[in-house]
Each structure stands twice: as structure tokens, then as C-alpha cells.
């Protein structure tokens, strides 16, 4: 507006000066009349032009104002429509955002509660997993212990199976011995019948001699007395032989009874064979004496005095035989009692081991079931946890997507609102300018007035209403962890928890003391025959069978090389007694058992026959089985000792030389002091090859523990009871062998 007024002033001033209109002093002095007239005319013309231009300008201004007012009304209507639409959109957006905010708040609250529940569940799961780790470690330890026990049980079962096979072999051998004894008893019965017949013949001869020898009454009376004595002796012999038959029958019954229970009867078989040989010897002596008696009775007329002496000798021999048989039968009864006690102990051991194995199998089954149950529970829990975690991840992903969508929508809406607000501000500014221009153009601009004084400050306007509460913003990032506060006071004791889960089974207690052996029960009735079992595994190689029948004589073959000298044979039956020879000089009688065997020539390797050479030592691997002390004595009789294993090479060589699954004694024992194993020469072993878990000094619940060492079939060392029966290995230096051979 100021610029317009300045332009009008400049135009007016320019026009006045141009037409020569100056101050009044100059006009009054210099102007002429024509000039005044001409100037007045020009003034009228100018006034007319000015009125025309003002009318034209007013008309144009009115047209422009009409156009402006129409545009303003249309713009107002459009802006009012837009504002109503924006208000409706804002209301809709407010409602939607409120609903969405409520739904998101509810969803966030539920999500937070779910997350808290999941955290609680995860804590419980971690606690359970920690507990389960402890239980699993315990189960693993118990499983390792069970594996060790199973290995020990397998070894004991293998040893028991090996013992059972050896018992079966001994039973088979004992059956053969029993058949031989039965044959011997039948032969003895035949011999007794022959002797009875010969005794009857002798009695008849004596009666005939009594009838014929009437003249020699004194001699006959003495002979009759002697004959009566002999008849009484013969009757006693008959009674003794009948008792022997009964004893043999009882022994047969006892052997049948022992077949079902005995496990190791080799010593009994050897004793029975020795007893049978002794009985054969006594019977042979009796046969020889009876033959001599018959010869003497034929020559009784000439040598009656010799007959009386022979009868006295017979009585003495008979008494000695009776005493010997009584002593031997007492020894047999004592041995039978010992065998019965051994059988009872063996049966109790077998029952104890069977019960122990049953308990172990039941414990193993329980542990397996508990392990499988816990593993299935853990797998189910883990699968459910995996499923819940997968669901949580899916829900969190979907919630994040929804939050991203909501944020993008809010951003777009806020951007739209900001654009609309800026447009509204621009429209308001344009409207204000138009209104100002409209008020200014309504009248002609007047002259510029003087500058007025500054007005007083108006009173402050009323305070506006309080706005609505804004929406809750998003939670900010978590702040840094504060310092740890002081320890609070101890809380009150909590409630007593529920009953915990059942703990793992404790370790097995120590072995109890063995009970007293119960009385022997009566033999039960034989049960019905069971169904035929499955075909078993091939058993170990059995003992050599009995000698078969003699075959047909074949053609003589090519003579082979001369063999080694054989063992001395069984002494044959004594021949008939010859006539008495002249008395010879008295000499020392050497028994057969103490006679030295012929020493065989040593082999080329410097060791005797049946001995094997390794480095500078000779080794003897026995075929027979003995207890530890007997094996020691056997090796000492061979001028050797039980083997001392000092190197790994020697151990490997001995392992290769061992045949089958038999155990062998070695010269190692802790009989002097427990758990101090020493060789028989008193030295401690430098090299050791004990089996895992050995020596354990297991006493089997009877008597002392295991104090003697031996080699098992795997070549490892194990401790045994010194009363066990095993093979053995003897050892001696090759130099001593060579010197003795020279």
C-alpha cells in the first residue's frame, strides 16, 4: 500500500511540474491570461480523463472481486469437503488405531504373559535337564558298573561251563570205570565160585583121607583139628566174600547216586582202581595159597607138619587180609563222606550263583525299563518343547510383521496428515492475504496519515482446554544394569514341597555270611520228560573213548622206526607156586611204587622227552590235573619247579603252547602274607599279566580265599583256591638237563 501511495504522489508531482505549475509567488507574477486559460482547459481535460480511468478501473476491480469471491466460495466448499473428509478419515483412523491399539495392547499383554510362561517353563526345563543330567550320569556310572559286572559274570559263566564240561568228561570216564568194576566183580564172583568148588573138593579129599588113615589116629586127630580150623577159616572167607558182594552192591548203588551229583571224581576213580588192584592181588595171593594148600594136602601123608605150618601161615595171612580190607573199607567210607560234603558244597555254590544271576538279571531288566521310560519321557518333552518353540517363533515372526505393517501405516498416515496440515496452513495464509487485499481495494487509498502512538498491551486471552491424553509410546530400550543392591533380609521359610521323584537305586550291599548247609532232602519223584531242546552248540572235544574190539589181523606192514620206551605195564597174574627152593640170603625188599623209572634220553634241543625248549629253559605242560601242592611236589620230583614268568616274550610263548581252555598252575602265591604275591623262591614278580579285576581273593563263601595263581585259557593270570584241580607247567634250566644227561 505504501508503494501505491508513493507512485501516485510521484505521478502527481511530475504532472504539476511538467505543466509549469509552481508556487504561488511565481504564478502571480509571470503568467499571462492565455496561459491561464490554456492551463484551465488542460485541467478539465485531465479531470475528465481521470474520471474515465477511475471508472474503468473500478469496473475492472469489481469484476475481479466478483471472480475472487466466486473462487473463494468454490475453494471454501472444496476445502470444507476436504476437511470433512479428512475429519471423517481421522475419526475412522482414530477408531481403527484405538481398536488396533487395544488389540495390540491385549495381544502384547498376552504375548508378554506367554513369554513369561515360556521363560518359567524353560527354567523348569533347565532344572529338569540339570536333574536329568545328574540322573543320566548316575545311570551311566551304574551302566558302566553293570557292564563290568556282566563281564565278570560272563567270565564266571565261562568258567562254570568249563567246569561243567570237565565234570561231564569225568562222569563219562567214571561210567567207564564203573563198567570195568562191574566186569571185575563178575570175574571175582566166578573166581569165588571156582574157589568154593575147590574148597568142596578139598573137604571131600579130607574126608577120604580120614577114612583111609585109620592107623595114624594121632596124626589124623591133629589133621582133623587143622581141617576144622581150615573149614572155619573157609567159612569165614565165604562170609567175608558175601559181605564183599554186598559192599560192592552198595557201592554200585552209591555210584548210581553219585552220578547225578558228583562234579569231579577222578581221585575216587583212581582210588577205586587201586582198591580193585589190591583186591585182585589179595585174591591172587589167596588163589596161590589155596593151590599150594591143595598140593600140600595131596602130600599130606608125608609132610603133615609142613601142612600144619602152612595152615598157620594161612590163618595169619587171612587175618592180615581181613585187617587190610577193614582198613580200606573204612578209608572208602571216609572218602565217600568227604565226597558227599564236597557235593553238598558244590550244589550250594551252584544254587547261590544261580540266585545271584537271577537277581542280577532282574536288576538289569529294571534298570533297562527305567532307562527306556526316562528316555521316552525326555524325548516326548523335547519334542513338545521343540514344537512350542517353533510355534513361538512363528507367532513372534507374525507379530513382528504386524508391527511393521502398523508402523508403515502410521508413518504414511502421519505423513499424509503433515502434508494436509501444511496445505491448510498455505490455504489459510492465502485466504488471509486475499481478505486483506479485499478490504484494502474496497475504497480508494487515502493520503498517508501521521504515525500514531503505540497502543497499550491487551489482556492475555483465556487458556485453552486441556487436550486429550496421547497414545502410549513404544517401550524404550532397556537401560544399563544397575549396581547390585545390598542383600535383603532372609525371607520366611517356604511351604514344604511335594514328594520328590524316586531316587536311583543304591549300590548293592556287601555279601552276607553264608548260611549253614541244610539237611539233605529226600529224593523227589522223577518229573515228566521235558520237550526236546534245540540243537546246542558243538561241545568241546571229548575224552578218548574206550578201546574197541580187536579187528582182523591185517598184513604185516613195513617196520617203522624204533619208538620211545613205553610206560611200565600193569603186573600180570602170579603163576602157580613152585616147589620151595633153598633158603636164600635175606635182602631188602623195594616196593614197586618206589622203583625208579628208566630215565629217557634227552632230545636234541637239550630237554628230556615231553619237555619243550624256549631260550635256556625247558618246560613241561602236564596232561594230568593236580592241586597246587601236588603239582609243586611233582615238579620237585622232576628236579624242577613251577614256572616263573619274568618276560613278555616268555608269556606269549607259553600262551601259544597252551592247548584247549584248561587252566595251568604257575609258581606264584600269597599264602605267606595276603596280597603280597611272590614266586616260590621268595622273589617278587617284575612282570605281571593279571586279568582285569584280578586278583580278587574271592572265597566263594567257604573257608579261605584264593591264594594260588594260575594261567587261564586267554593267557592271563588269575587267582585260584589252592585246593582247585588244574593242569600245571614245570620249568628247569637247560644246563642242569644237559649235565644230568651227561
Swiss-Prot record:
Glycans are attached at residues 67, 159, 168, 271. Residues 1-37 are cytoplasmic. It is found in: Membrane. InterPro entries: C-type_lectin-like, C-type_lectin-like/link_sf, C-type_lectin/snaclec_domain, C-type_lectin_CS, CD209-like_CTLD, Collagen, CTDL_fold. Its main location: membrane. The chain crosses the membrane at residues 38-58. Residues 439-608 are annotated as: Disordered. SUPFAM superfamilies: C-type lectin-like. Signal peptide: none annotated. The extracellular domain forms a stable trimer. The extracellular domain interacts with fibrillar amyloid-beta peptide. This is Collectin-12.
Amino acid at each position: 500500500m505504501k508503494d501505491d501511495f508513493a507512485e501516485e504522489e510521484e505521478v502527481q508531482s511530475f504532472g504539476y511540474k511538467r505543466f509549469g505549475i509552481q508556487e504561488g509567488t511565481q504564478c502571480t507574477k509571470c503568467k499571462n491570461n492565455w496561459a491561464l486559460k490554456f492551463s484551465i482547459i488542460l485541467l478539465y481535460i485531465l479531470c475528465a480523463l481521470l474520471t474515465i480511468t477511475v471508472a474503468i478501473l473500478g469496473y475492472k476491480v469489481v469484476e475481479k472481486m466478483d471472480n475472487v469471491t466466486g473462487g473463494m466460495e468454490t475453494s471454501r466448499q472444496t476445502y470444507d469437503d476436504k476437511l470433512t473428509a479428512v475429519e471423517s478419515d481421522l475419526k475412522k483412523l482414530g477408531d481403527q488405531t484405538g481398536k488396533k491399539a487395544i488389540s495390540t495392547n491385549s495381544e502384547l499383554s498376552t504375548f508378554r504373559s506367554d513369554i513369561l510362561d515360556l521363560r518359567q517353563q524353560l527354567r523348569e526345563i533347565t532344572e529338569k535337564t540339570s536333574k536329568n543330567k545328574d540322573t543320566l550320569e548316575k545311570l551311566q556310572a551304574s551302566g558302566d558298573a553293570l557292564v563290568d559286572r556282566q563281564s565278570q559274570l560272563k567270565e564266571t559263566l565261562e568258567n562254570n561251563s568249563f567246569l561243567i564240561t570237565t565234570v561231564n568228561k569225568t562222569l563219562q570216564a567214571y561210567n567207564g570205570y564203573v563198567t570195568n568194576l562191574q566186569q571185575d566183580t563178575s570175574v571175582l564172583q566166578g573166581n569165588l565160585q571156582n574157589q568154593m568148588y575147590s574148597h568142596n573138593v578139598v573137604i571131600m579129599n579130607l574126608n577120604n583121607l580120614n577114612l583111609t588113615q585109620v592107623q595114624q589116629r594121632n596124626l589124623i586127630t591133629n589133621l582133623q583139628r587143622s581141617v576144622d580150623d581150615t573149614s572155619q577159616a573157609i567159612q569165614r572167607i565165604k562170609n567175608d566174600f558175601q559181605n564183599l558182594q554186598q559192599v560192592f552192591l552198595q557201592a554200585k548203588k552209591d555210584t548210581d547216586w553219585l552220578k547225578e551229583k558228583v562234579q569231579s571224581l577222578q581221585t575216587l576213580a583212581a582210588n577205586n582202581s587201586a582198591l580193585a588192584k589190591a583186591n585182585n592181588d589179595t585174591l591172587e595171593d589167596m588163589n596161590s595159597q589155596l593151590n599150594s594148600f591143595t598140593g600140600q594136602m595131596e602130600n599130606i601123608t608125608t609132610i603133615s607138619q609142613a601142612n600144619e605150618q602152612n595152615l598157620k601161615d594161612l590163618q595169619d595171612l587171612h587175618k592180615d587180609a581181613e585187617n587190610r580190607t577193614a582198613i580200606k573199607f573204612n578209608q572208602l567210607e571216609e572218602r565217600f563222606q568227604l565226597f558227599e560234603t564236597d557235593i553238598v558244597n558244590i550244589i550250594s555254590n551252584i544254587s547261590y550263583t544261580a540266585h545271584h544271576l537271577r537277581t542280577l538279571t532282574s536288576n538289569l531288566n529294571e534298570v533297562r525299563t527305567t532307562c527306556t521310560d526316562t528316555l521316552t519321557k525326555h524325548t516326548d518333552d523335547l519334542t513338545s518343547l521343540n514344537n512350542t518353540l517353533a510355534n513361538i517363533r512363528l507367532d513372534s515372526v507374525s507379530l513382528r510383521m504386524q508391527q511393521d505393517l502398523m508402523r508403515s501405516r502410521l508413518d504414511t498416515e502421519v505423513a499424509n496428515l503433515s502434508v494436509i496440515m501444511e496445505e491448510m496452513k498455505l490455504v489459510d495464509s492465502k485466504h488471509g492475504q486475499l481478505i486483506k487485499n479485499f478490504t484494502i481495494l474496497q475504497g480508494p487509498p487515502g493520503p498517508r496519515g501521521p504515525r500514531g502512538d503505540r497502543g497499550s498491551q491487551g489482556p492475555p486471552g483465556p487458556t485453552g482446554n486441556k487436550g486429550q491424553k496421547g497414545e502410549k509410546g513404544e517401550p524404550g530400550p532397556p537401560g544399563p544394569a544397575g549396581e547390585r543392591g545390598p542383600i535383603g533380609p532372609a525371607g520366611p521359610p517356604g511351604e514344604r514341597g511335594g514328594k520328590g521323584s524316586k531316587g536311583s537305586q543304591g549300590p548293592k550291599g556287601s555279601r552276607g555270611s553264608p548260611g549253614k548247609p541244610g539237611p539233605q532232602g529226600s529224593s523227589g519223584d522223577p518229573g515228566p520228560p521235558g520237550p526236546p531242546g534245540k540243537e546246542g552248540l558243538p561241545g568241546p572235544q571229548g575224552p578218548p573213548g574206550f578201546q574197541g574190539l580187536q579187528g582182523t589181523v591185517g598184513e604185516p606192514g613195513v617196520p617203522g622206526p624204533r619208538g620211545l620206551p613205553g610206560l611200565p605195564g600193569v603186573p600180570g597174574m602170579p603163576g602157580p607156586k613152585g616147589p620151595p627152593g633153598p633158603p636164600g640170603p635175606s635182602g631188602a625188599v623195594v616196593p614197586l611204587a618206589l622203583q625208579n623209572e628208566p630215565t629217557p634220553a634227552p632230545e636234541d634241543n637239550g630237554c628230556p622227552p615231553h619237555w619243550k625248549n624256549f631260550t635256556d629253559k625247558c618246560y613241561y605242560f602236564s596232561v594230568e590235573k593236580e592241586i597246587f601242592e601236588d603239582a609243586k611236589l611233582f615238579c620237585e620230583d622232576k628236579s624242577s619247579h613251577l614256572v616263573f614268568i619274568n618276560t613278555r616274550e616268555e608269556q606269549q610263548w607259553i600262551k601259544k603252547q597252551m592247548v584247549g581252555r584248561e587252566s595251568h598252575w604257575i609258581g606264584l602265591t600269597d599264602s605267606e602274607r595276603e596280597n603280597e604275591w611272590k614266586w616260590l623262591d621268595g622273589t617278587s614278580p617284575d612282570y605281571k599279566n593279571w586279568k582285569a579285576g584280578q586278583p580278587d581273593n574271592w572265597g566263594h563263601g567257604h573257608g579261605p580265599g584264593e591264594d594260588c595263581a594260575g594261567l587261564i585259557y586267554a593267557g592271563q593270570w588269575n587267582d585260584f583256591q589252592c585246593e582247585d584241580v588244574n593242569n600245571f607247567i614245570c620249568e628247569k634250566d637247560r644246563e642242569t638237563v644237559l649235565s644230568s644227561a651227561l
